[in-house]
Amino acid sequence: MDKILFNNVLPHVFENNEDITSEVWRKDVEFEKGNTYLVEADSGKGKSTFCSYVIGYRHDYSGQILFDDKDIKAMRVADWTNVRKQNISYLFQELRLFPELTAFENVEIKNRLTGFKTKEEIEQMFERLGIMDKLNVKVGLMSFGQQQRVAMIRALVQPFDFILADEPISHLDSRNSQMMGEMMMEEVKRQGAGVIVTSIGKHIEMHYDKVLKL
């Protein structure tokens, strides 16, 4: 997948709103593989909706979203399964980790789908983000900031053309935010992928090829 295109997309909930000044909604926007994008939004402007459209969880919009030249509304369940396994990695704002499983088990569930990383590579990620001592601790016993780091590791243990990170550092201090951003970008460069980061304020401090106001 080389491009994600939004062609005049508008959530149904905003259809009667004539005052939309978004740089995404009702516009033609192209996200290219290899580039980094920051999508900034105020509360209630559709940030979570935007992410749900890209990952295929919702389709309640007018206009077109294309993966390369393919309209995503024509995609079937099997197509989406493959996209989420091979093309788009999604770091959920709400994380969606399994609290009864350990940090390593949460990551390994994802890694088993493709066998993309070795156990040693995964452990190196934990070490780098300062949570090696949490490797075998149940996620439900960890702080939200620690859980965010586990979720980032999980997002990086698969092949992808784009990584979609929804408010990835909301509960991290500047040092941990920087470390997580650096690790993400190293994996992105290894894979030649694109990055879409969303934020309603705090975001990873790094170079963005384009900043869009939702």
Which sequence ranges carry the predicted segments?
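Catalytic Walker B motif of ABC-type/P-loop ATPase nucleotide-binding domains
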Residues: 163-166
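Conserved ABC transporter NBD signature motif
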Residues: 63-72
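Conserved ABC ATPase "signature" region
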Residues: 71, 119-134
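ABC ATPase NBD coupling module
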Residues: 72-89
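Helix-to-loop junction immediately C-terminal to a conserved catalytic motif
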Residues: 55
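Conserved ABC ATPase signature
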Residues: 138-142, 146
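Hydrophobic anchor residue at the start of the ABC signature
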Residues: 152
